């Protein structure tokens, strides 16, 4: 065993030398700042609003009290009439339709008597339909946090002998990304 002692000491000494050569202390340095990349992908967004006389989104279009005189009356689009606004971050195509005839119980005013025009696209006076009609193609992108607005002129003829009462229908504006398939709902 005495003969092995020098070998054991030599082996231990070699292990210390080899360990010292490969020893790399781990040190952490405190820093006054830390940097991390952050990313967020913004999706294509189609967003519109329709307003009447400066009211809120989807405000009721109130044409007031009208005589049953078979005369066409008009309401110019703009801040005191109908407007559509886009907040989209892509080019859009804008469509319009109505739910059907203006109804008051079993009485009605034909939908052909309700018309629209303009949309800042020289849209000629056109009777509403129950299927979507394209009224503005490739409507641009507003500046960030802004909107673009177009006026919508409205026209209504109340036929002779239309019974008194409140007649209603629903106007739908819908938008899709430019050159996409036309909407079918709502």
What positions do the PLM features span?
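Hydrophobic alpha-helical membrane-insertion segments, chiefly the h-region
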Residues: 14-23
């Amino acid at each position: 065993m005495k003969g092995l002692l020098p070998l054991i000491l030599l082996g231990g000494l070699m292990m210390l030398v080899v360990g010292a050569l490969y020893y790399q202390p781990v040190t952490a340095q405190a820093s006054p700042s830390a940097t991390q990349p952050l990313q967020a992908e913004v999706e294509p967004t189609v967003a519109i609003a329709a307003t009447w006389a400066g009211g809120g989104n989807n405000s009721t279009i109130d044409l007031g009290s009208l005589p049953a005189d078979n005369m066409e009356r008009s309401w110019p689009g703009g801040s005191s009439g109908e407007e559509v606004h886009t907040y989209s971050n892509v080019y859009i195509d804008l469509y319009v339709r109505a739910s059907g005839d203006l109804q008051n119980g079993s009485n009605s005013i034909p939908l052909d008597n309700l018309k629209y025009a303009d949309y800042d696209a020289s849209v000629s006076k056109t009777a509403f339909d129950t299927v979507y009609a394209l009224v503005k193609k490739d409507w641009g992108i507003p500046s960030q946090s802004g909107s673009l607005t177009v006026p919508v002129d409205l026209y209504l003829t109340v036929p002779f002998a239309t019974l008194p009462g409140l007649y209603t229908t629903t106007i739908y504006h819908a938008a899709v990304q430019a050159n996409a398939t036309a909407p079918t709902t709502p």
